[in-house]
Amino acid sequence: MSGGKYVDSEGHLYTVPIREQGNIYKPNNKAMAEEINEKQVYDAHTKEIDLVNRDPKHLNDDVVKIDFEDVIAEPEGTHSFDGIWKASFTTFTVTKYWFYRLLSALFGIPMALIWGIYFAILSFLHIWAVVPCIKSFLIEIQCVSRVYSIYVHTFCDPFFEAVGKIFSSIRINMQKEI
C-alpha cells in the first residue's frame, strides 16, 4: 500500500479500497472485478458510497432525527380520539418523508453543486493563499522574534530579576490578638 494505491490478495490495483457490496456506479465491484479478471484502477472521484448508511460519521444524529413523538405529545388525561392520533401520526410521518424527498429532488443537486463549488474555493484559497501567507509570515517573523528575544534578555530579564530579589526579602508575620 503506497501512494494511496491498494493491492488486493490477487494483485488487483485500486486507488481506494473496494467493498464487497460494490458502489452506486458499479454494483458488486469485487465480484465483477473477479469475473473480468483484469487489473482495474478506480479513481477517488468515483469512490464508493454507502446507500444504506448515508451518515457514516454521524453528523446529523442529534439534529434532524425528529419523529412524531418528539414534536407532538399528549399528556395523561388529555388524549384525542385514537383514530385522530393514528391519522395525525401517519400524516406527519408521510408528509415529512415525501416532502423531504421532494425537496431533495428539487434542490439536492443544485445544493450539492453550490457546496461543491464553495468547498473547492475554500480548498483552493487554503492551498494557494492561506498556507503560503502563513509560511511567509513565519519566515518573516523570525527576524522580529530574534530582535524581540534580544530585547527581552537585555532589558526585561534583568529588570524582573531585580524586582523579584527586592520582593523576595519581604517577610509577613501574622499574629492573632485575643
Swiss-Prot record:
| PTM sites of type N6-acetyllysine | 5
Q: Where is region (Interaction with CAVIN3) located?
A: 82-94
Q: How is it modified after translation?
A: Phosphorylated at Tyr-14 by ABL1 in response to oxidative stress.
Q: Which GO terms describe its cellular component?
A: acrosomal membrane; caveola; caveolar macromolecular signaling complex; cell cortex; cilium; endoplasmic reticulum; endosome; focal adhesion
Positions of S-palmitoyl cysteine lipidation: 133, 143, 156
Segments carrying the region annotation (Interacts with SPRY1, SPRY2, and SPRY4) are: 149-160
Ranges in the topological domain labelled Cytoplasmic: 2-104, 126-178
Stretches for region Required for homooligomerization? 2-94
What keywords is this UniProt entry annotated with? Acetylation, Cell membrane, Golgi apparatus, Isopeptide bond, Lipoprotein, Membrane, Palmitate, Phosphoprotein, Ubl conjugation
Residues found modified as Phosphotyrosine: 6, 14, 25
Biological process (GO) annotations held by this record are:
angiogenesis; angiotensin-activated signaling pathway; apoptotic signaling pathway; basement membrane organization; calcium ion transport; canonical Wnt signaling pathway; caveola assembly; caveolin-mediated endocytosis
Please tell me whether the keyword Membrane is annotated for this protein. Answer: yes
Ranges for region Interacts with SPRY1, SPRY2, SPRY3 and SPRY4? 131-142, 167-178
Alphabetical list of PROSITE patterns matching this protein: CAVEOLIN (PS01210)
What is its membrane topology? Answer: Peripheral membrane protein
Per the record, residues carrying Phosphoserine are 2, 9
Covalent crosslink: Glycyl lysine isopeptide (Lys-Gly) (interchain with G-Cter in ubiquitin): 5, 26, 30, 39, 47, 57
Q: Does the keyword Amino-acid biosynthesis apply?
A: no
* Family, per entry: Belongs to the caveolin family.
Assembly, per entry: Homooligomer. Interacts with GLIPR2. Interacts with NOSTRIN. Interacts with SNAP25 and STX1A. Interacts (via the N-terminus) with DPP4; the interaction is direct. Interacts with CTNNB1, CDH1 and JUP. Interacts with PACSIN2; this interaction induces membrane tubulation. Interacts with SLC7A9. Interacts with BMX and BTK. Interacts with TGFBR1. Interacts with CAVIN3 (via leucine-zipper domain) in a cholesterol-sensitive manner. Interacts with CAVIN1. Interacts with EHD2 in a cholesterol-dependent manner.
Q: What is this protein called?
A: Caveolin-1
Q: Which organism is it from?
A: Mustela putorius furo
The gene name on file is CAV1
